[in-house]
Amino acid sequence: MKKTLFAIALMAATIAHSQEPTDTAKKFKPVAIPDDYNKQLDVVYTSGPGFQEKLDLYIPNKTSKLAPAIINIHGGGWVSGSKDQQGGFNPYFKNGFLVCNIEYRMTKEAKAPAAVEDARCALAYLKKNAKDLGIDVNRIVVMGGSAGGHLALMTGLLENDHRFDKNCADVKDMKVAAIIDKWGITDVWAWAYCCKSHSAKNWLGDKQTDEAFAKTVSPMTYLKKSSPPIFICHGDADSTVPIEESYLLHDKLKEIGIKTDLMVVPHAGHSLSGAKDQLKVMDERILVFLKELGVY
């Protein structure tokens, strides 16, 4: 039934393409870190002709035990957004996670698959520098919302498929412990055409009519028995990224036999708008999911 309704729900979202996430230039408060943490800001993790991407690291003081790590990827339809607008990391600080908060190339800088390449390079950076950072390479989680959710899914689901690992540290084992997908895009082609998403078409650029290419940058393409566990959260009134994208992902994960948890927030829009009180509930449920996996 969910699959039957998918196309209808996507078509209903056509009126929402103008609501795709955008940001205005403004100052954001710096992330407040605990006393037993230190930070490294604007660390260059990937570069190439005409670009240089940076990340922020919030690092727990070293102990005899290695720490888990979580990579956070901001949203914004691949056209806008910034690591500087991100926050809400306290649940992870309280549980000893290193937090890696990244920038990546926007559509105006480079079309698909550049953002995927950058997100993969952030993972490679953590893997390559794990010893110096005091983290466990087997307990790295990747997380994002909206377009960031899409990039988190791509980063983790590619596993050791290195097709997009350009301008990265040379790391063979690119598997992650888990993925946190918050209202992310799972099928770029469907979102571009059923929902008439300007963001998706702009990101695809001159390949926007190439369905085969769009599938190569769609998380659904890479699901398999070795895929990492995935936590999913989505509002059932999301008119920007229809919840059917998450239903399809969740159903396929269950079919394959991959551990997953889908949190559906009633009456919530994109980014859980209209139900912000559920953000805390989501964080708690994410931590339970990661605890069950032994990540921390």
Identify the residue ranges that each predicted region occupies.
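Alpha/beta-hydrolase superfamily serine-hydrolase fold, recognizing
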Residues: 19-296
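Bacterial Sec-dependent N-terminal signal peptides
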Residues: 1-24
